[in-house]
Amino acid sequence: MGLCKCPKRKVTNLFCFEHRVNVCEHCLVANHAKCIVQSYLQWLQDSDYNPNCRLCNTPLASRETTRLVCYDLFHWACINERAAQLPRNTAPAGYQCPSCNGPIFPPANLAGPVASALREKLATVNWARAGLGLPLIDEVISPEPEPLNSSDFSDWSSFNATTTSVQEERASTPSAPAFYSQAPRPPPSPSRPEQHTVIHMGSTEALAHAPRKVYDTRDDDRTAGIHGDCDDDKYRRRPALGWLAQLLRSRAGSRKRPLTLLQRAGLLLLLGLLGFLALLALMSRLGRAAADSDPNLDPLMNPHIRVGPS
């Protein structure tokens, strides 16, 4: 169990594998929609994670994702295509998670940000509306934009030649006379960005296992307190009296204001009173011990006291 760092400060068992922080369901939907999130116990058992979709083996951040009630994350297009291949008379229990075989449809009595977001997403397709008990709708298929590929340009030499000829024409064009004032060109509109061709020459094997991202949310200028722990020595065995050494170190390092005359007098009076009470207790104990061993105080040794039948 851990405490989420959001303003709600809720106790949660969920742990973000990428940012390495405890998250509640509200932060999970709002800020960690494409992160691998599971229980903290699973993080302790195995901290490795796969940032790719388990259905298409492509990075989860590349397309729109959806999170099931078991907190497994997939591409929405992959889940939709997989469920659309099932027969129309499939029961709601037949739609299962590809990873853990859990139910895709959230239970009716389950309330929470993750379940609500999943219901809103499932309500956009007919196969899920039938499982949720909603009337069917006319689906509008919106094709996803295909990324540009370097293979679209078959002859790069012609492309370079065209670019060179355009630059030569611009250089050969005479500049306008100085007495003609040219209006400044307006900046390009942000709504219509220029299209560029992006060529990725790296291999796709590096995307299968991405390194863990570490985001340290602690301030550098803030010194670690008594309970401060970093990730390196978080699970290291500590000595039995380590807390006492840290406490003494923190007490010795902090500056104290000098005591005033009244405070000194009160402290001396308190110490004197404690010493007087200790002296009284000691003298009382010693006096009782002396009285117990005194024969004059023993009733059996007194000749005027007769014990027994008369």
From Swiss-Prot:
Which InterPro entries does the record cross-reference, listed alphabetically? ZFPL1, Znf_RING
Indicate where this protein resides in the cell. Golgi apparatus, cis-Golgi network membrane
Q: Which gene encodes it?
A: Zfpl1
Name used for this protein in its record = Zinc finger protein-like 1
Post-translation: what modifications?
Answer: Phosphorylated.
Query: What spans does the record annotate as topological domain Lumenal, numbered to this chain?
Result: 288-310
- Which residue ranges are recorded for the region named Disordered? 162-196
Report the source organism: Mus musculus (Mouse)
Point out which parts of the chain are B box-type zinc fingers, as ranges: 1-43
